[in-house]
From Swiss-Prot:
Plays an essential role in the initiation and regulation of chromosomal replication. ATP-DnaA binds to the origin of replication (oriC) to initiate formation of the DNA replication initiation complex once per cell cycle. Binds the DnaA box (a 9 base pair repeat at the origin) and separates the double-stranded (ds)DNA. Forms a right-handed helical filament on oriC DNA; dsDNA binds to the exterior of the filament while single-stranded (ss)DNA is stabiized in the filament's interior. Residues 328-450 are annotated as: Domain IV, binds dsDNA. GO terms for biological process: DNA replication initiation; regulation of DNA replication. Domain I is involved in oligomerization and binding regulators, domain II is flexibile and of varying length in different bacteria, domain III forms the AAA+ region, while domain IV binds dsDNA. Gene3D superfamilies: 1.10.1750.10, 1.10.8.60, P-loop containing nucleotide triphosphate hydrolases. The gene is dnaA. It is found in: Cytoplasm. It comes from Mycoplasma mycoides subsp. mycoides SC (strain CCUG 32753 / NCTC 10114 / PG1). The keyword RNA-binding does not apply. One of its GO terms (cellular component) is plasma membrane. This is Chromosomal replication initiator protein DnaA. It comes from the Bacteria.
Length: 450
């Protein structure tokens, strides 16, 4: 029975009820509505808060009538229209938030796919190997051993393998775990009975594919290695696929039984190299798109990030997240320039910036003006040398944020007032001389991206 039929019959019954005054019925009951919520919950909605109070003495009568009509136990509550609408809006928000959470979770899960992996010279062979084995698990290259430094994309590839196999081979059971997780489980089970240890091994061996990320965490754990060795052999003997990743090649792994090292090399061992600049740049562009950054990020700004974060994909993603946060806080800025980025990443340690130091600034400026670095530090007062010296001081303050005293010391032991005058002079000239401004911008970009 739908709510319209219930409501129609309810009103007829209440109108015929001699205990309900006709004016009460016409003013407050005639306009009520009923809404169903869930399997057996009904809400009686009165027009106004005053109307809700007016029918208070008849609520039990209304409840009984509804139960008699439905002939089943139900839960009945009362409210008024304004409150009901507020609750609907609140429920809708909760539903939307829940939907957003689910969407984000799905998106997070789907991030680790072959389609989302940025391929470049540094990782192409590893990508091809993992994808090939995932398409034919247990057929060739068993085990597949991927190695390389942290942050190069090994975890992404292994999770992509898991997602691909689960999507395309529904009959295959896949187990993915980190080496640390496997070690902790093994240590726990080793405290228990022989029967429970065997059950642990059998449970893992029930899978068709085993993926262990960062297998190096199993090193120097003799008893754990014995369990691992048994599982390893079971998978190989039954043509079930093994994937491993490590920060070192099998030959360089310490703390493993030689039998395991030999078995790691049975299939295919392949390296993921350090990211080349081209691949790092492609990852940055993809991450900017993934994070839906509204501002345009200039190529110079992207090059800056790729130069200083190309050793770690996680750091690249973190740096783009920083851009995203800045963009959200500064929506009026439509373009993220290299000046903005260099200021945003001013906290990068000098060691990380490598050759980005005063020496590099002097070299770039002196090359532009056709003079030696010694001339910039020296006492010569020719116009071109003085201009180059002042620009180099200005850029040192602008890029490295050194103190006036530091800059004076770095430029031939000059007084800090000399540095102030140099900076002010360049700042004044930049406002008037468009060609000089263009030159300084080119020099700055070259220093930051070289």
């Amino acid at each position: 029975m739908n709510v319209n039929d219930i409501l129609k019959e309810l009103k007829l019954n209440l109108m015929a009820n001699k205990n309900i005054d006709e004016s009460v019925y016409n003013d407050y009951i005639k306009t009520i509505n009923i809404h169903k919520k869930g399997f057996s919950d009904y809400i009686v909605v009165v027009k106004s808060q005053f109307g809700l109070l007016a029918i208070k003495q008849f609520r039990q009568t209304i409840k009984n009538e509804i139960k008699n009509i439905l002939k089943e136990p139900v839960n009945i509550s009362f409210t008024y229209e304004q409150e009901y609408k507020k609750q609907l809006e609140k429920d809708e928000l909760i539903k939307k938030d829940h939907s957003d959470i689910i969407t984000k979770k799905v998106k997070k899960i789907n991030e680790n796919t072959f389609e989302n992996f940025v391929i470049g010279a540094s990782n192409e062979q590893a990508f091809i190997a993992v994808q090939t084995v995932s398409k034919n698990p247990g057929i060739s290259y068993n085990p597949l051993f991927i190695y390389g430094e942290s942050g190069m994309g090994k975890t992404h590839l292994l999770k992509a393998a898991k997602n691909y196999i689960e999507s395309n081979f529904s009959d295959l059971k896949v187990s993915y775990m980190s080496g640390d997780e496997f070690a902790r489980k093994a240590v726990d089970i080793l405290q228990k009975t022989h029967k429970e240890i065997e059950q642990f091994k059998n449970k893992i061996c029930q899978n068709d594919v085993l993926i262990i990320d960062d297998v190096q965490f199993l090193s120097y754990k003799e008893k754990t290695n014995e369990i691992f060795f048994t599982i390893f052999n079971n998978f190989i003997e039954n043509d079930k696929q093994l994937f491993f990743s490590s920060d070192k090649s099998p030959e360089l792994l310490n703390g493993f039984d030689n039998r395991l090292i030999t078995r790691f090399n049975m299939g295919l061992s392949i390296a993921i190299q350090k990211l080349d600049n081209k691949t790092a740049t492609a990852i940055i562009k993809k991450e900017i798109k993934n994070q839906n950054i509204k501002s345009e990020v200039t190529s110079e700004a992207i090059n800056f990030i790729s130069n200083y974060y190309s050793d770690d994909v996680r750091k690249i993603k973190g740096s783009v997240s920083r851009l995203n946060f800045w963009s959200q806080q500064n929506p009026e800025e439509k373009i993220i320039t290299i000046e903005i980025v260099s200021d945003l990443f001013r906290d990068i340690p000098t060691s990380k910036l490598g050759i980005l130091n005063v020496k590099k600034i002097k070299e770039v400026v002196s090359e532009k003006y056709g003079i030696s670095v010694n001339a910039i530090d020296g006492k010569a007062r020719s116009k071109s040398i003085v201009t180059a010296r002042h620009i180099a001081m200005f850029l040192t303050k602008e890029i490295l944020n050194h103190t006036l005293a530091q800059i004076g010391e770095e430029f031939g032991g000059r007084d800090h007032t000399t540095v102030i005058n140099a900076e002010r002079k360049i700042e004044t000239m930049l406002k008037k001389d468009k060609q000089l401004k263009k030159t300084v911008d080119i020099l700055k970009n070259k220093i930051l991206t070289k």
